[in-house]
Swiss-Prot record:
Main location class: nucleus
Domain of life: Eukaryota
CDD domains associated with the record: RNAP_II_Rpb7_N
Protein name: DNA-directed RNA polymerase V subunit 7
A single cellular component GO annotation: RNA polymerase V complex
Keywords carried by this UniProt record: DNA-directed RNA polymerase, Nucleus, Transcription
Pfam families linked to this entry: SHS2_Rpb7-N
Length: 178
């Protein structure tokens, strides 16, 4: 789910990027904010940082004594992406294993669908392994699958989420390729 957020942030601008007219200063603040925002990746509370939408307020700059850099407190609006337990999502399979499949959903790389949560699907080994049911519905690499999220885990060191998914429910499963 995408969330609209308003966040405070501190932006450091080197002295050489300061401009008396102010126009270049606002640009320098925006560039530094975008770089810092992109490098942060995600937080447990807000999910993955996706985009800065508006720079709402630039506070008064404070000069750092030893470096000469100027610290500007800013307020901006942005978009984040976070999944929740019980949410229905679409994932694209990128790895098929005997015990389940790994999918991607937006910036989330590890959504795991266990074979125990795929009723009626059987593993078929081979060069390109798949899961198939009696109706010949297939789950294989590059298949888009509609699933329900049954668990979420925040990985602090990697700064990313992992999720567990299930096909147990109405209207869940591989989406047709029509």
């Amino acid at each position: 789910m995408f969330l609209k957020v308003q966040l405070p942030w501190n932006v450091m601008i080197p002295a050489e990027n300061m401009d008396a007219k102010g126009l270049m200063l606002k640009r320098a603040i925006l560039v530094e904010l975008l770089e810092a925002f992109a490098s942060k990746k995600a937080t447990k509370e807000l999910g993955y940082y996706v985009a800065v939408t508006t720079l709402d307020k630039i506070g008064e700059g404070k000069i750092r004594e030893h470096t000469g850099e100027v610290l500007f407190p800013v307020m901006f609006s942005g978009m984040t992406f976070k999944i929740f337990k019980g949410e229905i999502i679409h994932g694209v399979v990128h790895k098929v294993l005997k015990h389940g499949v790994f999918m991607r959903c937006g910036p989330i790389e590890n959504v795991y669908l266990s074979y125990t949560k795929m009723p009626d699907y059987k593993y078929i080994p081979g060069e390109n392994p798949i899961f198939m049911n009696e109706k010949t519905s297939r789950i294989q690499v590059e298949t888009t699958v509609r699933v329900v999220v049954i668990g979420i885990k925040w990985m602090e060191v990697e700064r990313e989420f992992q999720a567990l998914a299930s096909l147990e429910g109405d209207y869940l499963g591989p989406l047709s390729e029509e």
